[in-house]
Amino acid sequence: MSSSLPILPKSLKDIPRSHNTQNILMPGQLPNDSMPLHQSATQSSISHPRASVVRSSYSAMLGYAANPIDSVSSHEGHFMAAPFISQSSNAEMLQSLCNNNTHGGHTVPTFFPAPACGAPDYMDTITVPDNHTQSGSSTVTSDAAKQNEWWADIMNDDWKDILDATATDSQSKSMAQPSNSAASQPAFNQSTSSHSGDICPVTSPPPNNSNASASKQRMRWTPELHESFVHAVNKLGGSEKATPKGVLKLMKVDGLTIYHVKSHLQKYRTARYKPDLSEGKTQEGKTTDELSLDLKASMDLTEALRLQMEVQKRLHEQLEIQRKLQLRIEEQGKYLQKMFEKQCKSSTQSVQDPSSGDTATPSEPSNSVDKDSEAALDPNRIGDNHPKNSTNVGANLKTAATESPDSPVIATDGSELPQEKRRRVHES
């Protein structure tokens, strides 16, 4: 929004001036019967951001020393505090002042807004003689009507801008943008207004905003309402395929809008995906733990298998040793059994054949040699066989002596004893 100060409108520039003007005075030559049209640019810019309030001194000529000027000054004081006050009363007062001046007076005031800040003050006074008062009254009334229309145009066009701006903002904008005044002149000329007292109403928020705010009111989701919502979502194929419009149609709840369903559906989706993510993390943690446990278990199993193989090897070695020992024991048992059988046979033969002693005597040395060899092999049986052999020899000698006393006796060592000695032995 550009704020600029209006300049003299075209309607005022085109007003025909009277040819009977006596003199046109400069600001330094202002007489007593003329009216200054512009008094202070700074005061007018403070009171209104776009158009200055016209101040005129009619007190000396027209007799309005107290009422009109005081009312204008009081309105100016109120403009500083409250810039949003209606200015219809000022417009009516200015119109009445212009009408009074044209009917009974000597001068015709030309109204135009104040120039931009920094421009030199100027005034333009046109004096009209008494005899031309009636002829110029029509031009003055038309001029006043155009002025009123121009003032109403300013109020109608810029009233919203005045409501939005503050007093300080208006001062800064009017001082900073004097060059935009020429560009804003066509906008004032194009607008038309019939009544100067019309004021634009204060803007209020559109009804659409109120409806939107009413539709976006918070709603408490009860467990029953949430269950119906979940049921509708499941009917539509899950939270991904469900749409707020379809859920709203299926729920059929009074006071429930599509905004409520949309927000609740978004929350439902996020709340549903969060446990899945947490479950995925827990599953990943479980898999890592299981892998570590599997590695540990496999290592333990390999170690146990290795120990088991070592134990089995040792057992096999021990079994081989035991088998070899058993074979040796069996061989020794067989050998001992053979020796025992031979001893039994020799003893039975000596007992059953006593008459074969003579024949057995020459074979005794051979038997004794065999027995000596067996005793060498088995020393445990030496003591057992020796007494048996001695008894057998003694018995053989007695039988031989009884049977043949005259036969020479053969000693055990193979030497023959003399006969005398045998007799002595026999007698004794």
Swiss-Prot record:
Keywords: DNA-binding, Nucleus, Transcription, Transcription regulation. Residues 1-10, 176-191 have a biased composition (Low complexity). The gene is PHR1. Residues 1-32, 168-219, 345-428 are annotated as: Disordered. This is Protein PHOSPHATE STARVATION RESPONSE 1. One of its GO terms (cellular component) is nucleus. NCBIfam families: myb_SHAQKYF (TIGR01557). It holds the Pfam family Myb_CC_LHEQLE. Residues 345-368, 388-405 have a biased composition (Polar residues). It comes from Oryza sativa subsp. indica.
